[in-house]
Amino acid sequence: MSSQTPVVTVDGPSGAGKGTLCMLLAKKLGFHLLDSGAIYRVLALAAIHHGVDTESEDALVPLATHLDVQFIAEGDLVKVILEGEDVSGELRKEETGMAASKVAALPRVREALLRRQRAFETAPGLVADGRDMGTVVFTGAQAKIFLDASAEERANRRLKQLQDKGLDVRFADLLSEIQERDDRDRNRPVAPLRPAEDALVLDSTSMTIDEVVEKALQYIESKLAE
């Protein structure tokens, strides 16, 4: 068995169920959790809290380098703790999202956040959720999973989520949004969305979450025992 800190990466397109899978894996394995998709929003929120200009690389790089953030699986949710405060609700605000898109466009900030994400690799282990965790951030991870599902299934899941919240949405619109995002993610010049060569590809289209977790755990346990 490897003496290095075990890292499990879960990549895949939007709506495939990565967040739920990672939360459940982190709980079952007793590992730390990294939600890389939220990290730019967290940095943007830290900048807002500290009065830092979200377009200033010089000001943002030290903030990114020392970003004090934790992702904690609790119940059915992942709580985001920034500087000791639960900011899960604030992360979803439009203001935070707009600031995050500015932050994400700055190359030196991206580099600083890449190093900060790698610092999550601490004992007893890490489950990292994202789009390029296995191909860019943790290329040496012992267990890599690429979780996929058809665009139609992902649109159906999103439709149900939004309808459960009382929102009136059309399946065709959601499907179109998902297909456009897939196209952007898979064809972007930097870190395009693709499975790592050594990843287990899991298609969750016709699987329950319990089946996905069981398959993933079997694979992880076999890789960590090598």
From Swiss-Prot:
What UniProt keywords apply to this chain's record, in alphabetical order? ATP-binding, Cytoplasm, Kinase, Nucleotide-binding, Transferase
Reactions catalysed = CMP + ATP = CDP + ADP; dCMP + ATP = dCDP + ADP
Name the GO cellular-component terms.
cytosol
Q: State the Gene Ontology terms under molecular function.
A: ATP binding; CMP kinase activity; dCMP kinase activity
Q: What is its EC number?
A: 2.7.4.25
Gene3D superfamilies attached to this UniProt entry: P-loop containing nucleotide triphosphate hydrolases
Q: Where does ATP bind?
A: 12-20
Extract the Pfam families matched here.
Cytidylate_kin
GO process annotations (BP): nucleobase-containing small molecule interconversion; pyrimidine nucleotide metabolic process
Instruction: Tell me which CDD domains the record gives.
Output: CMPK
InterPro entries, A to Z: Cytidylate_kin (IPR003136), Cytidylate_kinase_dom (IPR011994), P-loop_NTPase (IPR027417)
The cellular location(s) given in this protein's UniProt record come to: Cytoplasm
**Main localization of the protein described in the UniProt heading:** cytoplasm
Task: Give the family from UniProt.
Answer: Belongs to the cytidylate kinase family. Type 1 subfamily.
- Protein's recorded name: Cytidylate kinase
Q: Which organism is it from?
A: Vibrio campbellii (strain ATCC BAA-1116)
